[in-house]
Amino acid sequence: MHWYDTNGNPQYEIKKKDGGMRATTLRDARKHGWVPSVTTVMDIVGKPGLEVWKVNKAIESAMTVQRLVGETYEEHAKRILAHSRKESEQAAKRGVRIHNELELFFRKACIHSADMGDYETDIRKICDATKSVLDVNCGEQGWISEKSFCHKELGYGGKIDLYSKEWVIDFKTKDSIEDKKQLAFDSMAHQLVGYSRGLNGESRRMANVFISADNPGHVIFHEWPQDKHELYWNVFTSALDLWKHMKNYRPEEFNNEGS
């Protein structure tokens, strides 16, 4: 879970008593009046497609990971589960890495080149292709990268991949993207509208940019229809209200009391 303070600053970790750091919990958030992120809110809603994918990966791992001599059922099951999670963990790390490079690119900083060779070449292809598809579909924009915010009145926050006065953009990195394969799902629009309205309450055009990690330079732009923005917003605010009921925590009330 990700959290933000009332100034929009990320509060993903908190100091431990021994001086180290640990992930912020709901209990910590209650104490400080921190708000949940858009993605944390949307996690309260089931994702059937994702669950099917996880089950399929577990089945594949069960067929691949052989039971060792003398290994108990529980030990074997743990290895199968770890194997099934490995691919998604690697994909998540790669996605974070690409997001970080895109942030530098749109902030006009130098592309990170700690890993030289093919990696740097691939990253440049991804960044250039992303910029090109945005130029074609959005025109010239004053892009702002990785902006965090807090909507004090509704009690949620988040960090936006890219936005301007007219647009809110969220990047989605995938192993491969095929032109005829469905990439965009309504849950992505629910996430985007939370970002869009969370900035200052104004409506913006919303789009996902799907980025291929296996074929650097292949990107697909998907805009969400403007006539459905209000429907997406109703879904998001319903999820937000459900989250507050389930967690028995309304940060906007905490922060109003403290003001």
Regions found by a protein language model. Give the residues of each.
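Metal-dependent nuclease catalytic cores that hydrolyze phosphodiester bonds in DNA/RNA
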Residues: 1-156
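Mg2+/Mn2+-dependent nuclease catalytic core
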Residues: 143-252
